């Protein structure tokens, strides 16, 4: 059984990330270079071209916000995570997979990110898998690289929906 209203299509599934889209620091509004991300630091990023005065800003930032963390490459346990990173810099959705709260707490020594709403904890050195709390699955990772000018860029969109579970996730 389902509601007879229109299906959302791919609107819930896709974000503004696409191949070549620059990662922009949310605090400075400047494109990020690998040298801007120190080992053990947490930086928040958004796609280039997303402006606060845009009509759909809140909707788009809720799906596209990233946590950028630089880990020592030998501390990354998940093979895909390492392949999708650049020199140990990983990009994960900032949106908790439990109820969609923004994750903002990071513990350098353990590489754990904590959602302040219900304490779901994710191991960012192991594919952002859930290690504690009510979140049902890992944070989606965005594949990143560096363009010819030396800026961090997306190599596509997330390969799975961002945020909490919804009708399409199975």
Curated annotation (Swiss-Prot):
Membrane-topology annotation of the record: Multi-pass membrane protein
Q: Where in the cell is it found?
A: Cell membrane
Which UniProt key words apply to this protein?
2Fe-2S, Cell membrane, Disulfide bond, Electron transport, Iron, Iron-sulfur, Membrane, Metal-binding, Oxidoreductase, Respiratory chain, Transmembrane, Transport
Extract the InterPro entries matched here: Rieske_2Fe-2S, Rieske_2Fe-2S_sf, Rieske_Fe-S_prot, Rieske_Fe-S_prot_C
Domain Rieske: start-end pairs: 63-153
**PROSITE patterns registered for this protein in UniProt:** RIESKE
For whether the record's keyword set contains Signal, the answer is no
Disulphide bonds annotated for this chain are 101-117
Annotated [2Fe-2S] cluster binding lies at 96, 98, 115, 118
Q: Which cofactor does it need?
A: [2Fe-2S] cluster
UniProt remark on cofactor binding: Binds 1 [2Fe-2S] cluster per subunit.
Checking Pfam families in the record gives: Rieske
Q: Which GO terms describe its molecular function?
A: 2 iron, 2 sulfur cluster binding; metal ion binding; monooxygenase activity; oxidoreductase activity, acting on paired donors, with incorporation or reduction of molecular oxygen
Q: What does this protein do?
A: Iron-sulfur subunit of the cytochrome bc1 complex, an essential component of the respiratory electron transport chain required for ATP synthesis. The bc1 complex catalyzes the oxidation of menaquinol and the reduction of cytochrome c in the respiratory chain. The bc1 complex operates through a Q-cycle mechanism that couples electron transfer to generation of the proton gradient that drives ATP synthesis.
Assembly: The cytochrome bc1 complex is composed of a cytochrome b (QcrB), the Rieske iron-sulfur protein (QcrA) and a diheme cytochrome c (QcrC) subunit.
Specify the protein name. Answer: Cytochrome bc1 complex Rieske iron-sulfur subunit
What gene name is listed for this protein? qcrA
